[in-house]
A protein has these predicted regions:
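Amphipathic alpha-helical assembly/interaction segments
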Residues: 1-147
């Protein structure tokens, strides 16, 4: 199946679902943590699908696409650090901690694999021009005539 949108990407769907779960989980933290650790883990978890979507929007520039996948991977690691903090403060059980750490480990591996795929085989439109010109714009359409 051809990927038509970032919403077709497994890494986007998995990260979005995890971010929703983390959001719900964080609402059960003590009130004084709602704007501290609760806010931090919500932002880092939501950053992952956001970076994947933004990278997809820049997919015509391979290096930009990869950069945003790297940001998503970094946010995945950041979320795991926040999970360690909240487990250490006993806001979640050890079982919950292990459950989410394992799922974020899997997500990180999937993001890394997708990033490797993009690096090795993904051709931006600029790279494709030699074999498939696609839409070719005429620069004359952008010239300004003197009045």
């Amino acid at each position: 199946m051809k990927t038509k949108s970032y919403k077709d990407l497994e890494i986007y769907n998995l990260s979005f679902k995890l971010a929703q779960e983390i959001h719900e989980l964080s609402l059960k933290f003590p009130k004084f943590e709602m704007y501290e650790e609760g806010s931090q883990i919500r932002r880092s978890s939501k950053s992952i699908p956001s970076c994947i979507a933004e990278g997809w929007g820049r997919r015509y520039y391979k290096n930009e696409f990869i950069k945003f996948l790297i940001y998503a991977l970094a946010s995945c690691d950041e979320t795991k650090v926040h999970l360690d903090f909240i487990a250490g403060c006993h806001y979640i059980t050890e079982e919950q901690h292990q459950h989410y750490i394992e799922r974020y480990n899997v997500l990180g591996m999937k993001i890394n694999k997708y990033m490797q795929y993009v690096m090795k085989s993904y051709l931006s439109p600029k790279d494709k021009q030699e074999t498939d010109p696609g839409i070719v714009e005429n620069p004359e359409h952008y010239s300004i005539e003197d009045e």
